[in-house]
Amino acid sequence: GAGDRGDAAMVAYGASRYALSKGDKAEAEKLWPLIEWCLEYCRRNLNESGVVASDADELENRFPAGKANLCTSSLYYDALISAGYLGKDLGKPVAAYARQATALKKNIDRYFGGTVEGFDTYKYYEGNDVLRSWICIPLTVGIQDRKDATIQALFSPRLWTENGLLTQAGSETFWDRSTLYALRGVYACGETEKATDYLRFYSSQRLLGEHVPYAIEAWPEGNQRHLSAESGLYCRIITEGMFGIRPTGLNSFVFTPRLPQEWDHMNLRKICAFNQVFDIEVKRLGDQLQVAVIADGKTISNRKIKEGENIRIKF
């Protein structure tokens, strides 16, 4: 195959978030050994700079990824945080994961942070001097140290096109997955208006344009075929970006709603997560937001918050 694409980081990231969101303790117990193994695999593959070594990424050498890439370490970072939440609810010893996450966050900035094409953002790998679309990935895992320059770079003419983000500046190749991650990350950073403008543009192009009605995988490879994973990533722009939902336990989450200025309300209904079915309703009240969480006809929380404030929910 393509070698180590950072699969262990991907599995740990996805499985821990899935287990938390599902809210099924028995299923989480079954997944725990897999998550633990993947985290340990990543730890054993840390290089001398404290980031994860991998000889490829999900693009499988279509574009250079060096000996350690930003994507793998960012996913590992988020996986450590999610595993900390999950392990706590399962009664597992998880203190080491928090320490490892703190160290990794510093190492990511030290190793990957730098100026690329005039933007104080991230090198995708050591020696990378051309902007890459995956500089968006830290924004999706709560790493915002370089958010301003990173967002400027993402939406600069070097990367942004009528088809979303180019995989690499100067190329003609685009894979929708990085555009979909980027839009989620820009919402997560609180750049709501910018994210909404570009989400509207992307949606009219992809979902309502000539090649419809789904997000696509790539071009020119595969001739813009539709894959379900990209449509899932589109949904995550809404759930994790616009509504800012972040699981913190098998029956708890934190969320930060990002209501676009020209909207007076937004609702997300019949959310099936944390072993519940619930709604989130957000209304604009002057310079504040009225935010309600309703499950089984009962109001779990109803609060006024400032823009950018988060709300913690425990069922």
Region spans (language model):
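Non-catalytic C-terminal accessory modules of carbohydrate-active enzymes
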Residues: 188-315
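Aromatic/His-enriched, Gly/Pro-containing loop or helix-boundary segments
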Residues: 1-5, 17-18
